[in-house]
Each structure stands twice: as structure tokens, then as C-alpha cells.
């Protein structure tokens, strides 16, 4: 092989086969010296990253940059590379794309396209001895999350990718747009985003706190829209929306998102864990004969039909109960 001879021993198909690691080339019979000779000025290849080669002379596409970043970050440790040929298994190891690059690959409109990013963030286990280089920014995790796959590439879950993106952003409008889109487009739930931002110690930043307030408001609005959709799509009777339930003397027992007076049935949108003070209100209402069904935003998004069955079943059960105590229903 001379320096102008491209790799043609095996058919090359798709973006993956235009970006190869040194270990993959070695498994195909291409030595380190031969690979280096292909990258001399005027040669057909170029070294994209340490140990990663681009098998054409032009600029890399956005997918080639991401694939190269994953090959660099996912390569085995040096000791394993010296031990022998590439082992069978995932070519990226435990590496996954995170940050703005991951959000762009998920399809976020608020994230710049990968080609416009000056770096690609790649998440790896904390134990990996790996340095950031060129356009690759190494991000570490004590316990890496389970990746999602898009375009054949492992991506950090949206909430983790958001936290890693926000960590490097100081532009408040961009942070707000990213967080809002995550919820509005149904990528993840607000609680999951807040958990990741808290774990990354980002909730002390003023512009992040402001964005989280908008995120929670957006999440609430989206969940309410889904509750309206559930009632109408599944033919449930129209309830009273967004009301306070009070005793005749004026003491308020709690706010609910939907209430069917004839069945004394209330539906409340809530987080998986009841909010502070919510349990006491619910218990008081149930002692008065009011059934309270709690639905989470996630269940409304992922299992709307099942939640409709729960509500319909509660309505049917109301026919066998003693009449509820009189409560006053007030607009919230």
C-alpha cells in the first residue's frame, strides 16, 4: 500500500465506514504506519482525532464528526489495545453523545445543528483516563445513564443531555427555549429535568432558576391539555375544570383539576410523589366521600387510555357508595 491507496479491501457502506479507528484499521490489516502515510499532504485520508481517521480528504459531515468523537471516547484503554485485536461488542464502548450535540440529534429546534457546534460533548465513565481534544469535550459520570439510540448512535437521555448543555450555557433565552421544548415536545417530564439540573448543581444559577420556573409552568399546561384530551377522546362526561372544593363553612379542602359532582369524583394532576400538604387534603376529601384520582403527567403522556379506564372505573364504583357529604365547588 502506498500513501495514495485508499482502503478498498472491504466494501464501504454509509457514514460509519468513512470514519475508522486505528484499532479497526489494524483489524483490516492496515498498520499505524500505513494509516499515517495516507494522511500526508495530498493523501486520500486525514486524521480526524487521535487514533481516528477520516477516509476522504474533504471536511467531515456532522454525522462523521459525531461518529469520530464516539470512536475516540469509546476506544478501549491503551492496555487493552496493546493486548490484541478489537474485541467483539459495541464499537463505542460506554461512550454516548450528550449536551447540545445530543439535543440536535434528538431533533431539538432550539439546539444548533451539529455542524454549527464548535465541540461535541461525549459522556464517559468517570474512571476513563481520557482527555478532551480538538472538537471533543469529554464529560464524566460516576454512573453513566442508559443511552438512547438515534441514527445508530448512543445518546444520553434527554434530561441528562439538557443538564450537560445548560452547564456550558450563559444565554438565558437559549436555556429557556431548550427546557421548554423538552416538555412541550414530549421528550421528557419536568421532574426528570429538575432532578438532573439539581444533581449537576445548576439550580443556584439565576438564569437557570428562571428557566425552571417557566419549565414547570409549561409542564403543568401540557399536562392539563392532555387531561382535556383524555376526557374528550375517550368520551368521559364533561367535568368542572380547575376548581376548589370547600366545606359549606368556607374551609378549603384543596384544589383539583377536574371534578364530577354527581359521582363526587376528583382528578388531580400531580408528581409521582404527592406534594407537601396534598395527602392531608386527599384524605379529608375521601373521608367526606369524595374519590380523588391522582394522575401523573407521565402517565397522561404514555398511557392516556389506561388513565381514562381508571377514571371511568371510579365513576362506576361511585354508584355503589354512600352519597358524599355536601361540598362547595368554587372556580380556582
Which residues does each predicted region cover?
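Surface segments flanking catalytic/ligand-binding clefts of nucleic-acid enzymes
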Residues: 2-4, 30, 183-332
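Short gly/ser-rich loop at a beta-strand->alpha-helix junction or flexible surface loop bordering the NTP-binding
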Residues: 1-204, 240, 316-332
Amino acid at each position: 500500500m502506498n500513501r495514495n491507496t485508499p482502503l478498498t479491501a472491504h466494501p464501504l457502506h454509509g457514514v460509519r465506514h468513512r470514519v475508522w479507528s486505528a484499532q479497526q484499521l489494524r483489524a483490516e490489516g492496515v498498520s499505524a504506519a500505513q494509516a499515517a502515510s495516507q494522511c500526508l499532504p495530498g493523501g486520500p485520508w486525514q486524521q480526524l482525532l487521535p487514533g481516528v481517521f477520516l477516509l476522504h480528504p474533504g471536511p467531515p459531515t456532522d454525522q462523521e464528526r459525531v461518529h469520530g468523537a464516539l470512536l475516540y471516547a469509546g476506544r478501549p484503554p491503551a492496555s487493552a489495545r496493546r493486548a490484541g485485536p478489537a474485541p467483539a461488542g459495541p464499537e463505542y464502548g460506554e461512550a454516548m453523545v450528550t449536551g447540545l450535540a445530543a439535543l440536535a440529534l434528538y431533533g431539538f429546534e432550539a439546539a444548533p445543528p451539529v455542524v454549527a457546534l464548535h465541540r461535541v460533548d461525549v459522556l464517559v465513565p468517570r474512571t476513563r483516563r481520557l482527555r478532551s481534544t480538538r472538537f471533543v469535550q469529554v464529560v464524566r459520570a460516576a454512573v453513566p445513564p442508559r443511552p438512547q439510540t438515534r441514527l445508530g448512535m448512543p445518546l444520553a437521555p434527554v434530561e441528562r443531555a439538557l443538564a450537560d448543555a445548560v452547564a456550558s450555557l450563559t444565554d438565558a433565552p437559549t436555556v429557556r427555549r431548550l427546557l421548554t421544548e423538552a416538555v412541550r415536545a414530549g421528550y421528557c417530564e419536568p421532574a426528570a429535568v429538575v432532578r438532573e439540573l439539581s444533581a449537576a448543581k445548576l439550580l443556584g444559577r439565576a438564569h437557570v432558576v428562571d428557566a425552571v420556573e417557566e419549565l414547570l409552568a409549561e409542564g403543568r399546561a401540557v399536562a392539563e391539555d392532555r387531561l382535556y384530551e383524555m376526557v374528550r377522546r375517550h368520551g368521559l362526561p364533561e367535568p368542572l375544570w380547575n376548581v376548589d372544593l370547600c366545606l359549606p363553612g368556607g374551609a378549603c379542602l384543596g384544589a383539583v383539576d377536574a371534578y364530577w359532582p354527581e359521582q363526587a369524583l376528583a382528578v388531580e394532576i400531580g408528581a409521582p410523589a404527592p406534594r407537601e400538604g396534598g395527602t392531608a387534603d386527599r384524605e379529608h376529601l375521601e373521608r367526606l366521600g369524595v374519590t380523588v384520582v391522582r394522575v401523573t403527567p407521565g402517565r397522561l403522556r404514555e398511557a392516556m387510555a389506561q388513565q381514562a379506564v381508571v377514571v371511568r372505573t371510579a365513576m362506576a364504583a361511585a354508584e355503589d357508595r354512600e352519597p358524599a357529604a355536601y361540598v362547595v365547588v368554587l372556580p380556582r
